[in-house]
Structure formats: structure tokens, C-alpha cells
Amino acid sequence: MFKSGFEPVTAEPVFQKTVNSAFIGTNLETYLRKNQICHLVVVGLTLPHCVSTTTRMAANLGFEVTLLADATASFTLSNKNGQAISPETIHEINLLSLQDEFAQILTTEEFLTQVQV
């Protein structure tokens, strides 16, 4: 279930999802509120699908969201005419659609500088 080196630490909660949003069909929201977690840092695959959906829902539920642009990825998509749109273009457009309204968009380095890790 987890890539080697990315396994959860002991007692770390795991929320297994079956749809694009990490909030649908899981107790993620309940866990976050119970533990008074109000700021989420979102990473993962893929940006135009699960990452975007989870980010939008988190913001709509009142959470503060930071999305790490370089810790997400997109794949080539084709439009209805079969024209391939590059992963870089897909990624940039999705980041722009989330920026400010749903999330603060940062690189991992920018985020780590802010939290002084």
C-alpha cells in the first residue's frame, strides 16, 4: 500500500479513500476537527484529480490549505480532438485554478523556509 520509505510511523493515522476526495467516505474531517488541526499541507498524485478535489473540499470546509507545487504531479491529457496537452501545462493551469481561492501555492523549499525546519 505504501512505497518503501514512505510507510506511516507508529500510531500515525491512515485514511484510505476510494474517490477523488480524501474527505468523502473517510473520517478525515472528523479526525482533523477532533485534533484541532486547521492547516493542511497537501501533496500527492495527481494534481488535476485527487489533489485538486481534496484541496477544494478542504478549503470549502474551512481549512487553511497550502499546496506544495513540486510535491504533486500531472500527466498528459488529450482534448476531445485528440490533441495532447503536456503535463507541464496541465500542472500550471491546475495550480493557477487553486491559487489564492483554495490554497496558498508554495514549493517545498519555500514551505520549509516558512516553518523553519
Describe each model-derived feature in a short phrase:
Residues 1-117:
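Active-site-adjacent betaalpha module
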